[in-house]
Each structure stands twice: as C-alpha cells, then as structure tokens.
C-alpha cells in the first residue's frame, strides 16, 4: 500500500508555522497572512478570526526583563496604583471580548462606508488607528458597529445588551477623559462624543444626542482656540471631524425645532478655510461647505416665522406680504445659493473615486442646493405648495436623486433632500418614486432612514394641510435627517 510519507507531503514543505497568526489559523495549523482585523482565510467567518493571544504575548514579551538578583520585584505603592490602570485602559483588551473582532471588521468594511461613503480613505484609516490607542473611542466605534449590524440583520433586541455594554464603557471612558485637562484637548475625546452622538441619532435617542452634540461643540471650540496659538493648519483628520459635526448640526437645525449649536453656521470659518475644499463639493457633507451658513440662516428664519405667526396653534397659507427685511433676506439667500450651484468635486476626490461616483457627488450637491431653495420658499417666504417656484425645486431634487444609482453609496448623503421633496409633493408618481428610493436607502441599516420613511408615510396618510415641520412639531415627533 502506497501511503503518503510526511516528507513528501507538500503541506509539510514550508517554513515552520508562525505563532502570531489568528486563533483559527493556529487551530487548523495553516499559514496565516496576518491581515487585520480579519485574515484572508477567515473572511467568510470573521467571528472566528481572533488575534487576542498574540496581543497578550507580544505585550508580555516586550515588558519582560531579566530579573536582577538582590533587588525587590514589587513596585512602590505609587507604581502599583498605575500598573492595573494602564492594563485596564489597553484598547486591544477590548478585542478579546466575544464578537469584538467581528464588530471591528464590520465597522471598517460596512458602517463607516455607510456613514461617510465618499470620505477620503485617510479619514477611516486614521479613525480606526486612533481608536486602537484610545479605549473610549474604540468602545464607541464597537457600539456603533453593533447597532448598525443589528439593524442590517433586523434583530435589534438580540444585540441590545452588547450595544449597551460598549456604550456604557465609552461614556465612562469619556467622562474620565473630560476630568483630565490633558485629555480634554485631544481630538480623540471630541471624536468619541461625536460617534456617540451619531449613534444616538441613528437609534432615535432624542435626549442624549443633543447632550453629546453640545459637548462636542465645547470640545471643538477649545481645540480650535488652541490651534490658533499653534503654527500650521489643522490636520485632515481634525478637519473631517469638524465637517462631521457641522453636517449633523446643520441638518438637525433644518429637520425640526433644534436651533443648532453654532447659530450662524460659520463653523469656525470652515467655509473660508482653503484646506476644506472651498469652491468644491465636500466629500464628508455631500455639498459645498459654502452652503452651510446659508442653510443655518434658512433654519433661523424658518423658526422665527413659526414663533412670530404662532402657527403651532393655527396655520393657514399666508395672505399678507412679508416684511421688507425678510423679503430682502430671502432674496439675498436665493442669490447666494444659486451662485454656488455649479461647484464640482475636487481633483483629490476624483483621484480617490471613479468617475460615476464623483458625478453622483455633484448630484448630491445639487439636491442640497434645490432643497435649500425649497425650504427658503416654503418655510421663509411661505409660498404655497402649488407655487411654480416650489414645484420647480421638487422636480429638480427628484431629477438629481434619480441620477444617483438606486443602491449607490451616495444615497446615504441625500436623506434630507429626498425627505424634503416628499413632504412638498402631492403627485402620486413622485411619491411612489420617493418611497421606492427611501426603501432602498433603508437597507443601509441606518435607523434615522427608517424613521424618516415612516414619518413621511404618516404625514401623507394624515392628509394634513399644515406644513410638514408644523405637523411634526404638533405631533411631538423630532427627526434628524442626517
């Protein structure tokens, strides 16, 4: 009988097996390519790919030193109090928890691509690398990843405890960081609060997202005050954080009664910073940063109209002319919005993405431009839904939405425009097209998309004559169309 000799087995004609591979490759006794967070062999079953033992071994080996005879090994009381604290703050220890490797892999490959589908690669890479050195940020990312995964598989209750565990750890770590003056002025601290805020928005936690957003405002203000005394411009990662905050704050201010944390929409001169792609469509926001102060002003004027006309109690289409001041403001806003309509993605954006995706980014920008005009006409000038200027903006929004592929990543950027168009149309074909596109967007696993679609259907079914923002305010429903 011709049996196989171990010496002739090709599987044995290889270098000795490394001991720093993932747990699954070591168990199967196969070579691991050491890719993080999931190696190539485990890509189909990422939950089984763990590097926890290698983390411990490497750290233990690095810290090990030769004992010196005659000298005590016990540290002083002061040192003893530090050692367990440092060990507990090791972020890599988080990845030894069940499912943490899978959740980190899911965040890198899925969650961040849904939140910021066109962001420059350096943003995601830096975010994850920073989290590996910052426990509270890592916990926040794991909580966001778990929330997103739970919505994708439509089993939120099954993962609720895991989300809560990582959220509580992130909040505890954030509080500890805020108590330390040296930690408060680190971008990582503001980033943790921003991740928690965004996850609250996606989960519909109306009370806590405002608390976190207000905290981010204070942290960023302090950080930028320090930057003014330092040489050079903010790094790209920090600018992405600024734009992330600005995009959420702007849309929160336009979605309901939230006044915005930065009322004038200037966002620390983001719109005049050459490093923010001034004159181009921004990859984080999906529109030009020059539109930010104009959107903020529209939100201000809209809220002032609601207050002055007391339309929370009774609302009818306006029969009196606008004040001279408001008319002038509206005309100025219209001119300034139209002046930036033709902005296109930057050369850097074109280098990172294919031509189709870059073209869709221009469509997202135009969708925001026409949505801004729609809100200006309806909520500031108080034009009726049937007015030609209003109808023209609804048509233009839907034209640019249709120019974006149904399942393109760019759909993640257009929740506010498509919701705005849906609230201002009575045309059945337009409503059907909007519902179909929003159903596609809902499959991305962001909870605010689901709530927006449900709210729009509720508004349509009500047949209410009042404007959408008035209707939702009276109903006690608050949305953040981010």
Specify the residue positions occupied by each region the protein language model found.
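Intrinsically disordered, low-complexity activation-like regions
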Residues: 1-184, 202-482
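Acidic, glycine-rich active-site loops and adjacent beta-strand->loop/helix elements
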Residues: 196-200
